[in-house]
Design a protein with these regions (language model features):
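Short alpha-helical transmembrane segments in multi-pass integral membrane proteins
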Residues: 1-22, 79-151, 199-258, 314-379, ...
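Small-residue hotspots at the loop-to-helix junctions and early N-terminal turns
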Residues: 48-59, 141, 145, 208, ...
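Generic alpha-helical transmembrane segments of integral inner-membrane proteins
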Residues: 26, 30, 34, 38, ...
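Short runs within selected transmembrane alpha-helices of multi-pass transporters and secretion channels
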Residues: 72, 148-166, 174-182, 207-223, ...
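Helix-terminus/linker motif at the lipid-water interface of multi-pass membrane proteins
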Residues: 30, 34-52, 121-135, 193-202, ...
């Protein structure tokens, strides 16, 4: 028993370090998703079409968000290991790389959404639904998208700074900036969606304006606070004196980071395609999935934060060259993540019958959403394992393996399964959703074998 405890569980200092990193991320993400949930409920009170339009656009912008996440994460692997070596110059190179790549991705997103926004939204409106509801959903979606585009550059800058701070083990400032932004978003949502205290009742437009304002505030807070404290953040000193990056550093980041950028972008596109496959079962499914994803995002922060803890802690240990400690730490982190998320799954299952009642929509949509939430809860422990395995592979720079493990599997297995079941069978959305989730068990087995073999154990900055 003692041997098992030592192998799979850490001591007090171990968990203190883990939760010093994970808890601020959980708090920030938790508050963010809680306010997003309230935002979603507020929009849902206007009507099903407005809720569906906003949901579709958020699914499209989710691809951009994960593209930025991939852009900063590729360089972030090096940031964590440079920090483990206390190499300030190296950290500066990664920040510049993140910013330049983020600008390019943002310009591309602007072009795609402005030129092809209506076409992208229409892709989700192919299922059953009246012509009137489809037109209304498209109208609200276009309104929301055009305003949300203004916030993309601010989101990108925030992610560049927040990711760098986290990779250096500093999670408090991003949390504080996130909380401030969330409170601003919540207050403006209430004022601008419903027109309270003399403000205009802008509905969907009000929700978009509130989000953009909150992102501007978050960017201002995190950038100013970081640069005003060069003692704790030495990488800011001379950071923009030049934007040059040594060619060998660029080459290493591109080699390791490109698969990660492609992975996050293709994975997000895969998730958007899954939603499109599900929507073939009718417009009511879009609404039910929106309700499901809203509450799921709140509970998914548990394994998302633990995954980031894996990437940061294991990455820093790999930077020191202690492979034995990295492997031992990673094993304990994976076990902790799965156990924590099992408890989270039970709580989500209990809440499933209650949450859909907050939406002003039909009983059929509420019932479908309740069952989808229960299915999602059932697979949270599996997702916790998958997330920890993915971040383990990524921490050691095995980004090509992570690419095949994550996005290639998504497109070749998940999307193909969803499309086949949606178009070639009469199965309900509940069974289709269940079987798609179940296919990830194969990915879990593959990931477990790769991590156990130790293919990820390497220092990539020496």
């Amino acid at each position: 028993m003692q041997r098992i405890r030592e192998k799979y569980f850490g001591d007090g200092r171990f968990y203190k370090r883990v939760f010093m990193i994970a808890i601020p991320i959980m708090i920030q993400s938790g508050i963010t998703n809680f306010v997003n949930m309230l935002d979603n409920i507020m929009i849902g009170q206007i009507g099903t079409e407005s809720m569906s339009g906003v949901s579709i656009v958020n699914q499209i912008l989710f691809v951009y968000n994960l593209c930025i996440f991939g852009a900063v994460s590729g360089a972030g692997i090096f940031t964590a290991q440079y920090y483990g070596q206390q190499n300030t110059k190296g950290i500066q190179y990664t920040v510049r790389f993140k910013l330049l790549l983020g600008i390019a991705a943002t310009l591309l997103a602007f072009g795609i959404c402005i030129a092809g926004g209506p076409t992208l939204i229409n892709m989700y409106l192919k299922g059953e639904g009246t012509a009137e509801s489809i037109r209304a959903t498209l109208y609200y979606g276009r309104q929301y998208m055009l305003i949300m585009l203004v916030g993309l550059p601010f989101y990108m800058i925030t992610q560049v700074y927040a990711s760098t701070l986290r990779e250096c083990g500093k999670t408090i400032l991003p949390m504080k900036a996130g909380i401030a932004a969330i409170l601003i978003n919540l207050a403006l949502n209430y004022l601008l969606i419903y027109g309270k205290f003399g403000f205009p009742a802008w509905g969907v437009r009000g929700a978009a304006v509130a989000t953009v304002c909150s992102r501007i505030a978050e960017t201002a807070i995190i950038v100013m606070a970081t640069h005003q404290n060069p003692v704790d953040n030495p990488f800011v000193t001379g950071l923009y004196r030049t934007m040059s990056i040594p060619r060998d550093v660029i080459r290493k980041i591109v080699i390791k980071g490109t698969p990660l950028l492609l992975n996050e972008t293709l994975w997000a596109a895969g998730m958007a395609s899954l939603a499109g496959c599900y929507s073939l079962k009718g417009l009511h499914v879009v609404a039910a999935l929106n309700i499901t994803n809203t509450i799921a995002n709140l509970f998914n922060i548990s394994f998302a934060a633990m995954g980031e803890a894996v990437a940061i802690i294991v990455g820093q240990i790999l930077g020191t060259g202690d492979m034995k400690k990295a492997k031992d730490t990673d094993r304990k982190l994976i076990v902790s993540s799965v156990l924590l998320c099992t408890g989270v799954a039970v709580l989500m299952f209990v809440i499933a019958p209650v949450f859909p009642r907050f939406y002003n929509t039909s009983a059929d949509i509420r019932s479908t959403a309740m069952r989808l939430i229960m299915i999602t809860a059932l697979f949270i422990p599996q997702n916790a394992l998958l997330n920890a395995l993915y971040f383990t592979l990524r921490s050691g720079g095995k980004t090509m393996i992570a690419f095949f493990f994550d996005s290639v599997f998504m497109w070749c297995v998940n999307v193909v399964t969803a499309f086949s079941l949606a178009t070639c069978t009469t199965l309900s959305i509940l069974w289709i959703y269940y079987f798609v989730q179940l296919t990830d068990s194969l990915k879990a087995v593959i990931g477990f074998i790769l991590v156990k073999k130790g293919v990820w154990l390497q220092n990539i900055v020496d």
